[in-house]
């Protein structure tokens, strides 16, 4: 039997008898430990040898023997808990301790900086698993950030100013409006050791052609080593930014044959995935990264939904609960929570119904019904971006005839959506409208793969906003279902850099197709000893650029 299993058995005994010495029998102990009398005798011998207890046996069946505890079960439990924490076995820790509040405090005490075996380790607490890290698929906000740490594109978009920077390619040029050339760095390696080949780039980009944003790519070739040519059906001013977006990250061409690639992907980025399961994501600095090696050696993201649900709205937590004075940064998101009206729905495609719903469901009406801790993090939205005021207040018209029931759909693992849907239910019920709630996984929501009148979601944009605002929404199949046919004309104007984003956004809002609700305050909590931390528009920070000052500094 392993030491950990023996410790658990001892703790069960200690808890059963409250640490008090007692007279008992082998049969009674067998019932406590749910095993045979013979096995109990073996366990007692091992526990006695470890110095945890003294077992003074009396000969004969049914004879009462003396059980004397020499070690506190609490002390042993604490020792074992510390070992599990050190080994990042959070699931086993929850089973061992049992008390969720106690586990939470233990975890919070270990957040932030750790120094082990010569390595700098950053520990983060998060509220849900990060199970899909495959570029080119439906990625939520935090998955998008992680993918940027694991992969590279031909170009990179600077998170702070939106400027285009070299990445896998060191230079690029437009030979003609329909022909772009990228010059790649040599000797770039994937995390599994193989050198990047031009065929990896070609396969990574051609796999994206079926997607709306990439449908104008005609062909990708490599005329000579370390050169990639991209041919287009129509000109695209934004192509270099598009090839630096998270969808266009470069994968090894054999990615489909790699086991569980969406969860444990292989890239060329500054961090490689060591472990990714439902309770932990661990990434490690890649020593053969072609850029500057990351300064933090390892990032551990502990996932405990039942212990960290409030992180849905409070932000990324790198330190214990007493960090009010240690908040690193906060910002109002570039994006919003919103309602989309599905044009496939007979009710949602009716302008009068959409107008009436938007007049009823105002940000102020929702905030007035929200709990105080939500009010702290929500700011009323009157446009897609905080600086835009496109949603004009109008007088409430009478309810359209025949409107008695609506279906609202949102994605799971997001407690704020539950709160918003409850408020919407109350507002509509007061008007005689029943609201049916439908919850999907994120991929089905992203695809719009359900019948619904209204869709509840959120979008986070990044710099440059002229690129990301349209790109983020247009690449979403759900939006293709919900918006009018004009969207397909808008893509050409956007690619020509003639689409004015403020006007485009105002059109969607004024036509009651896209209804902004809130802008969210993003907050990053952590230690002031951390340096190089700049919160990005996704509420995270670039791991490879962060570092710790020595404790005495």
UniProtKB/Swiss-Prot annotation:
Annotated HTH marR-type domain residues: 1-113
Record-linked InterPro entries: SBP_5, SBP_5_dom, SgrR_HTH_N, Tscrpt_reg_SgrR, WH_DNA-bd_sf
Residue ranges for the DNA-binding region feature of this UniProt entry: 26-49
Swiss-Prot/TrEMBL GO biological process terms: negative regulation of DNA-templated transcription; peptide transport; positive regulation of DNA-templated transcription
Lineage top rank: taxon: Bacteria
Region (Solute-binding): 163-494
Any GO MF annotation of the entry: peptide transmembrane transporter activity
Keywords assigned: Activator, DNA-binding, Repressor, Transcription, Transcription regulation
HAMAP family in the cross-refs: HTH_type_SgrR (MF_01449)
Job of this protein: Activates the small RNA gene sgrS under glucose-phosphate stress conditions as well as yfdZ. Represses its own transcription under both stress and non-stress conditions. Might act as a sensor of the intracellular accumulation of phosphoglucose by binding these molecules in its C-terminal solute-binding domain.
Name the UniProt record assigns to this protein: HTH-type transcriptional regulator SgrR
The organism of origin for this protein: Yersinia pestis
Lineage: Bacteria, Pseudomonadati, Pseudomonadota, Gammaproteobacteria, Enterobacterales
Name of the gene this protein is made from: sgrR
